Amino acid sequence: AGQFALTDGAEGYRANYNSLDLAGNKEMIMYKKYVVGLLYHATQDYCCGSTQTNGLSRSAFNAYLMKDGSLPTGDDKGRLGTADEGYNAGKPVIIDLLDARDPRLAQQIDGYLGYVGNGRIRYEGMPGQETAAENTVSTGYGITKFDEPVTPSKFRQATNGNETDGPIFWLAEIILNNAEAYAELGNEAKAAENINKLRARAGMPTLKLQNDPANNMGVSDLIWEVRRERRVELMFDLNDRYWSLI
């Protein structure tokens, strides 16, 4: 006990996924080290490559609570803005939408839309990104959770050049497992105690059970909120989300 601890804040949350070196990360229980030329991956390229990439669905977007903990209304009409400068000037941005939601959403997707006919360049103008290729996303909501601007674009946008470390077991998932177990046993207090650790890190209010109209699974409000937390915390985490769903 006490050997591991959650990283700090929304930025600490994202650092679990896009760090070039996870050594010393207090949340990591086990991770995989990547080094270009020895062992590499293509996760960043899958999120920013020149070919169209997959994106967040609108259904997933609406799973994120508002920043005050209330249920999302889905009424975002008239809240799109446009970028002021740079390559992306004049293109639609969703920064206001992200600011109104659970802060984890802004750590997971871009603040602007990118789709066919309206491509964008992430980290445009930053050192090492001068040759970055334009990217489009199937849904418009580009995945930025695993990306970082330090790796030059010639490696970021390559299937043999990504070297960010890969988390395997980390504390947040253990906390989610505890919360789910307590929820299944009907222990609301203990389930909430675990969920609130993650919400505090994200900058969200404590757990509040709500009668969500989106709950079409016939489960209790407690189970529904625990599953929401797991969905939001582990969004895009592939293997972890897959086993959560089956």
Regions found by a protein language model. Give the residues of each.
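Acidic/polar-rich alpha-helix caps and helix-coil junctions
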Residues: A1-C48, T82-I246
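Short, cationic low-complexity segments
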Residues: C48-G74, G128-N135
